[in-house]
Amino acid sequence: MSAEVEVFCDGACSGNPGVGGYGAILRYGSAEKELSGADGDTTNNRMELTAAIRALEALSRPCAVTITTDSQYLVKGMTEWLSGWVRRGWVNSKKEPVLNRDLWERLRELTGKHQVRWVWVRGHNGHPENERCDALARRAIDAYRNERR
């Protein structure tokens, strides 16, 4: 895997559940691509996962990917919890069905194609790309609402 790609992603929700949005930035060398979208009935965690999914779906070939997010749910899910969920048949340590299984399964499928490193950053703490992704997600929420007026 020669291509090294940086991904920054964030999800947001106005109400939880409620209207949600995601934002992602893909960086390959000096080139950048921004992605964003919204959903009318979702949760913050679903948008965090969707941001990473959409970013990985945008990659056309296997890459070494560093994904930076402010979501501990996403980072811990992928680095600590996922293998146990799969081993236990998609139930968590409390013997309850894993929430957002559809998105976790898609992430698992997509990350299998790449060499992925997960990085957590504190949200709303001045990290430039995280702030940009948050703004993309919030703009997607606003656009979604404006389209439905």
From Swiss-Prot:
It comes from the Bacteria. Binds 1 Mg(2+) ion per subunit. May bind a second metal ion at a regulatory site, or after substrate binding. GO terms for cellular component: cytoplasm. Residues 1-142 form the RNase H type-1 domain. Mg(2+) 2 binds at residues 10, 134. Signal peptide: none annotated. Gene3D superfamilies: Ribonuclease H-like superfamily/Ribonuclease H. Its main location: cytoplasm. InterPro entries: RNase_H, RNaseH-like_sf, RNaseH_domain, RNaseH_sf, RNaseHI. Pfam families: RNase_H. GO terms for molecular function: magnesium ion binding; nucleic acid binding; RNA-DNA hybrid ribonuclease activity. It catalyses: Endonucleolytic cleavage to 5'-phosphomonoester. Mg(2+) 1 binds at residues 10, 48, 70. The keyword Endoplasmic reticulum does not apply. It is an enzyme of class 3 (hydrolase). PANTHER family: RIBONUCLEASE H1 (PTHR10642:SF26). Belongs to the RNase H family. Endonuclease that specifically degrades the RNA of RNA-DNA hybrids. This is Ribonuclease H. It comes from Geobacter sulfurreducens (strain ATCC 51573 / DSM 12127 / PCA). The lineage of its organism: Bacteria, Pseudomonadati, Thermodesulfobacteriota, Desulfuromonadia, Geobacterales.
